[in-house]
Amino acid sequence: MATAGVAPASGIVDVNASSAIAVDKLPDEILGMRIKDDKEMEAHVVDGNSTEAGHVIVTTIGGKNGQPKQTISYMAERAVGQGSFGVVFQAKCLETGETVAIKKVLQDKRYKNRELQTMRLLDHPNVVTLKHCFFSTTEKDELYLNLVLEFVPETVHRVIRHYSKMNQRMPLIYVKLYSYQICRSLAYIHNCVGVSHRDIKPQNLLVNPHTHQLKLCDFGSAKVLVKGEPNISYICSRYYRAPELIFGATEYTSAIDIWSAGCVLGELLLGQPLFPGASGVDQLVEIIKVLGTPTREEIKCMNPNYTEFKFPQIKAHPWHKIFRKRMPPEAVDLVSRLLQYSPNLRSTALEALVHPFFDELRDPNTRLPNGRHLPPLFNFKANELKGVPAEMLVKLVPSHARKQCSLFASS
């Protein structure tokens, strides 16, 4: 199929991760509308379904709107992730030598695949690119959708684990880079596309270890959240699950992604999960240990239908005591703004981007520890900046970076 804009790579599930992968139990949520006689959904079907190393898959792309057809061959190299959704494997394009990730999921023939529909809408430097897709069949006549994605070699999860094993703190510049790019990807999907990711976690944040550019992946749980329409609450991996989800809310907002981003930032700073709950209920206990018992008003903000109130009264633990003594106060402040019980009191992704914690990234003299330049951080497109107040715009795009920003370049 024709190249679509940017999108996730991998519903990579790290089998060593201790958190539960709740979204894998929700196939009905992942598959959206019924398929009609839709030209857009046409894709070449290839026989065979092997992902064993050395297996070659041949498919064709193009052939629509006057485009020439092109044959592409992929050789499977190794599995890089698996779950009940299917498998993600690394492959090499034999024609170009390019390495890609192919996410293969069982496709219900009655429905469109929501992940594919979402990914076709996406085009952003901090979201993994969907190159094209094709269907494959097995001897049992099972149909699989194969998403051919940009390959990014590392995950934030593995980077955190690397520093943890070395008994070292992650350099603060990397914490800033990763969390800034997470917020930028969320600002884009929330404001420009109108989609909530619903499974933000370190395993779904891919990193190029040389440039430290971060890309959000795995849109298997992503959904347009419409006000007044119910959604499932059993979504998002446990350690990163917003409290309104634990309270069973079904009319939540994209603020659930902001909570998850706050949990990831806390984990980057601590070197371990901020709220490591052993179960859904225990997850809430871990949150209460830090934020204190939510007030009746806060519970009402999270889930108006929740009537039980049987929690022990625990005072909030000061954030600065959660982190090491020399932790910059700006880091602690940003965590506290992202991790609010009331969803409407959490910072938005755009508000987070202009937080003083990221001021170092806006300094034109800032470099990576190896002396190299930072990855592109301010190459905003016009749709990313639409409706942004002037005072925020000035902070968002520093003067030295305005040439690479389309809005300023055209003015």
From Swiss-Prot:
Pfam families according to UniProt: Pkinase
Disulfide bonds listed in the record: none
EC number: 2.7.11.1
Reactions catalysed according to its record: L-seryl-[protein] + ATP = O-phospho-L-seryl-[protein] + ADP + H(+); L-threonyl-[protein] + ATP = O-phospho-L-threonyl-[protein] + ADP + H(+)
GO cellular component, one term: nucleus
The entry's keywords: ATP-binding, Kinase, Nucleotide-binding, Phosphoprotein, Serine/threonine-protein kinase, Transferase
Active site: 199 (proton acceptor)
InterPro entries linked to this entry: GSK-3 (IPR050591), Kinase-like_dom_sf (IPR011009), Prot_kinase_dom (IPR000719), Protein_kinase_ATP_BS (IPR017441), Ser/Thr_kinase_AS (IPR008271), STKc_GSK3 (IPR039192)
A GO biological process held by the record: cell differentiation
Family: Belongs to the protein kinase superfamily. CMGC Ser/Thr protein kinase family. GSK-3 subfamily.
Protein name per the record: Glycogen synthase kinase-3 homolog MsK-2
Organism: Medicago sativa
